[in-house]
From Swiss-Prot:
<protein>
    <recommendedName>
        <fullName>UDP-N-acetylglucosamine--N-acetylmuramyl-(pentapeptide) pyrophosphoryl-undecaprenol N-acetylglucosamine transferase</fullName>
        <ecNumber>2.4.1.227</ecNumber>
    </recommendedName>
</protein>
<feature type="binding site">
    <location>
        <position position="285"/>
    </location>
    <ligand>
        <name>UDP-N-acetyl-alpha-D-glucosamine</name>
    </ligand>
</feature>
<feature type="binding site">
    <location>
        <position position="190"/>
    </location>
    <ligand>
        <name>UDP-N-acetyl-alpha-D-glucosamine</name>
    </ligand>
</feature>
<comment type="similarity">
    <text>Belongs to the glycosyltransferase 28 family. MurG subfamily.</text>
</comment>
<comment type="pathway">
    <text>Cell wall biogenesis; peptidoglycan biosynthesis.</text>
</comment>
<dbReference type="GO" id="GO:0005886">
    <property type="term" value="C:plasma membrane"/>
</dbReference>
<dbReference type="GO" id="GO:0008360">
    <property type="term" value="P:regulation of cell shape"/>
</dbReference>
<dbReference type="InterPro" id="IPR007235">
    <property type="entry name" value="Glyco_trans_28_C"/>
</dbReference>
<dbReference type="GO" id="GO:0051301">
    <property type="term" value="P:cell division"/>
</dbReference>
<dbReference type="Pfam" id="PF03033">
    <property type="entry name" value="Glyco_transf_28"/>
</dbReference>
<comment type="function">
    <text>Cell wall formation. Catalyzes the transfer of a GlcNAc subunit on undecaprenyl-pyrophosphoryl-MurNAc-pentapeptide (lipid intermediate I) to form undecaprenyl-pyrophosphoryl-MurNAc-(pentapeptide)GlcNAc (lipid intermediate II).</text>
</comment>
<keyword id="KW-0131">Cell cycle</keyword>
<feature type="binding site">
    <location>
        <position position="163"/>
    </location>
    <ligand>
        <name>UDP-N-acetyl-alpha-D-glucosamine</name>
    </ligand>
</feature>
<dbReference type="InterPro" id="IPR006009">
    <property type="entry name" value="GlcNAc_MurG"/>
</dbReference>
<dbReference type="InterPro" id="IPR004276">
    <property type="entry name" value="GlycoTrans_28_N"/>
</dbReference>
<dbReference type="Pfam" id="PF04101">
    <property type="entry name" value="Glyco_tran_28_C"/>
</dbReference>
<dbReference type="GO" id="GO:0051991">
    <property type="term" value="F:UDP-N-acetyl-D-glucosamine:N-acetylmuramoyl-L-alanyl-D-glutamyl-meso-2,6-diaminopimelyl-D-alanyl-D-alanine-diphosphoundecaprenol 4-beta-N-acetylglucosaminlytransferase activity"/>
</dbReference>
Length: 363
């Protein structure tokens, strides 16, 4: 192994934490030895390259129940585990993207006086960023407005880094349904969304009659495949690595509103129907969705208000055909596309790379 400095990346759980960290890591791996810290039995092992030396902790997010004290005790024990890892691997810098693995990592790093950078991708900062952000050397923000929630932190707006595929044009995979009908990408994030899946199943007859083409990503949350006798216009998958190609080439995305998804839609200039996860902490998914809804590039439907009728009426409105100068077009969809083009893009991973490499001068 070359005599590079050692960077510990602490990111685990959902794609919203893992994918931004992966995007940054690939930008800086030429100057740093990468060590990755994740959580046992999560998505980490499926996505983290073996060369990044994945280590895992057996830790769970605290819940409001009788086992709360026990769970915080496990976080404390995890802090000692992280201290041991930091010493063993001779870590020079820690980069984390939030989530419950971040708390013991930040505490351990500060006890050893190792600099820490945390990236907060949501508009409303998560619990770890709120409570431990002041211990970090930098808190990097996915949205400028997040700064107002973190008055005691050293914040810098960088945007949220995306997977490399989103920064280049991709061809539509050949397994996607072919035809002239509008292409819908329906997904619920890396873990899936039962509510979105259910409303889609209830509306499939309507969608097939309207000749929509559908790619349905059901997610990894142990949901069973539905045995559906549908036309060739419907494809169902648990997960795909070609999500950038799907979003870039579809007509409309129907999804949750995690920060990663919001930024992928902005980069791809793609209109959407967003159905925020109602139990997200601080209602951050709804706040994320409002960014695109306020810009006119998305329609926000709260899960408590969604129904087969509302879903179908919304699609009919978006895809209502208007005639202009003898040509047919989708007036509302075209307006949503134009509004998405006006959202500012930022090459976030390049900005974050600057801050990580800044610490090279300190060693």
């Amino acid at each position: 192994m070359s005599k590079k400095n050692n960077l510990l990346v602490a990111a685990s759980g959902t794609g919203g934490h893992i994918f931004p960290a992966l995007a940054v890591t690939k930008e800086v791996e030429d100057k740093w030895n990468i060590h990755w810290l994740g959580v046992h039995k999560r998505l980490d092992a499926n996505f983290i390259p073996k060369k990044y030396n994945l280590r895992t902790l057996n830790i769970k997010t605290p819940r409001k129940n009788i086992f709360l004290f026990y769970q915080y005790f496990r976080i404390l024990m995890s802090t000692f585990q992280v201290i041991w890892i930091l010493k063993e691997e001779k870590i020079n810098l820690v980069f984390t993207t939030g989530g419950y693995i971040s708390a013991p990592t930040i505490i351990a790093s500060k006890l050893l006086r190792i600099p820490v950078i945390i990236h907060e991708s949501n508009l409303i900062p998560g619990m770890v960023t709120k409570n431990f952000g002041f211990l970090c050397n930098y808190v990097l923000l996915g949205f400028k407005r997040t700064n107002s929630y973190l008055k005691n932190c050293k914040t810098i707006f960088t945007g949220t880094p995306l997977r490399e595929q989103f920064y280049k044009s991709n061809l539509l995979p050949d397994w996607v349904p072919q035809g002239k009908g509008p292409l819908l990408i329906v997904m619920g994030g890396s873990q899936g969304a039962k509510a979105i899946n259910q409303i889609l199943y209830e509306s499939l007859d309507f969608l097939m009659k309207k000749q929509f083409r559908i790619v349905h990503i059901i997610g990894e949350c142990n949901q069973k495949y539905f045995n559906l006798n549908t036309s060739n216009n419907y494809v169902q998958k648990k997960f795909t690595n070609e999500i950038a190609a799907l979003i870039q080439n579809c007509d409309l995305v129907i999804s949750r509103s995690g920060a990663g998804t919001i930024n992928e839609l902005i980069e791809s200039e793609k209109p959407s129907i967003l159905i925020p996860y109602p139990n997200s902490k601080n209602n951050h998914q709804e706040k994320n969705a409002m960014i695109l809804a306020e810009s006119g590039g998305s329609i926000l439907i709260n899960q408590n208000n969604i129904s087969k009728e509302v879903f179908e009426e919304t699609l009919e409105r978006i895809f209502k055909i208007k005639s202009k100068k003898g040509k047919n077009h989708y007036e509302i969809l075209d307006l949503m596309k134009k509004n998405m083009e006006n959202n500012k893009k930022i090459k976030s991973k390049i900005e974050i790379k600057k801050f990580i490499n800044y610490f090279l001068k300190e060693f």
